[in-house]
């Protein structure tokens, strides 16, 4: 090309959750059946959408308006419905004008980070959902700035570590919180959220809280939303329907803007997000039309309770299978539908492996992992020997070696097999 055309931030873009699929497809050619535990798509894992939800959507499809553009921020009726849900919680109060729809939260995340001044940093949790960490690092053109989630303390944020990293890095202007958390399944107590808000207030920061899993909370944990604790701090809550209905293929998410009137700089920032959406015209109309009718339906609360009971059962089974393994730190997931497992360092020697029967497949895998992290080696050995596809924990912006696995499998017998096999192969890997 006449000139260099690649932005310096492009090197920071990574999404192992999908990238591993290419390797898995190659492994399928060796006759291995793949069990996909790498991505959080409940529908792909066999979850059935209730008929009453399908009936609502089918009726909307017959309405010609569902094929038209909608207002740039989203349908007014839907935004009013969602604003009312926030206001019922008694914390910060918003209007429909404080909500903007996007084509999935991936779209929202790209704009949220992409419209920040390049020198500004948003500190991410570690581990962190890779869409956030990659987008933030790409915007800045340098690796993510992170704070530690402690696997020895239920994956809760280390607040002292967070404060130090804010205090000694003046570029940090925002804090990312993911609650319930992906990839760990942690659900944060109100006390921790209050402490994060206090830090944001003290250092004059804004908060981004990804709450896409906010209605997937179980094991007796209580849901606490940012809107309940944010007080006068500026913030954005990210929500959507991909995981909750679930309707991931709709690509429908939104941001709720809190306290934009409290800071002129933050107000201009959210105005820039809106203007970026103006250029795109709007987000998809049909799923927006469905939201009030589905979430306001008499069956919806019961439906959420049923889903949470299912994931609670899965969480407890998975934890029981893995918690007593030597060399493993396992925490019970209490929200979302993922579990993250950590390998203790003193069990890792650089030569850990899992036996692969097919010599040609073994040769292929060992070529793939020649310079890989230890946990990526585990993931690829596991994939080749069993067909189970999980994601290395280091791909979630973490220094910890381990993996993330979903709790989505609907078939009880197969779910038991997945976690029995994981336990067996973890033991083999850590003892070689």
UniProtKB/Swiss-Prot annotation:
Subcellular location as annotated: Cytoplasm
Superkingdom of the organism of origin: Archaea
Enzyme Commission number, as recorded: 2.6.1.-
Top EC class for this record: transferase
Cofactor(s) the record lists: pyridoxal 5'-phosphate
Listed InterPro entries: Ala_Aminotransferase, Aminotransferase_I/II_large, PyrdxlP-dep_Trfase, PyrdxlP-dep_Trfase_major, PyrdxlP-dep_Trfase_small
CDD domains to which the protein is assigned, alphabetical: AAT_like
GO cellular component: cytoplasm
Modified residues (N6-(pyridoxal phosphate)lysine): 243
Major site of localization recorded for this protein: cytoplasm
GO function terms (MF aspect): pyridoxal phosphate binding; transaminase activity
Biological process, per Gene Ontology: biosynthetic process
UniProt keywords, alphabetically: Aminotransferase, Cytoplasm, Pyridoxal phosphate, Transferase
Alphabetized NCBIfam families for the sequence: PRK06855.1
Family membership: Belongs to the class-II pyridoxal-phosphate-dependent aminotransferase family.
PANTHER family xrefs: GLUTAMATE-PYRUVATE AMINOTRANSFERASE ALAA
Protein name in UniProt: Uncharacterized aminotransferase MJ1479
The organism of origin for this protein: Methanocaldococcus jannaschii (strain ATCC 43067 / DSM 2661 / JAL-1 / JCM 10045 / NBRC 100440) (Methanococcus jannaschii)
The organism's taxonomic lineage, starting at the top: Archaea, Methanobacteriati, Methanobacteriota, Methanomada group, Methanococci
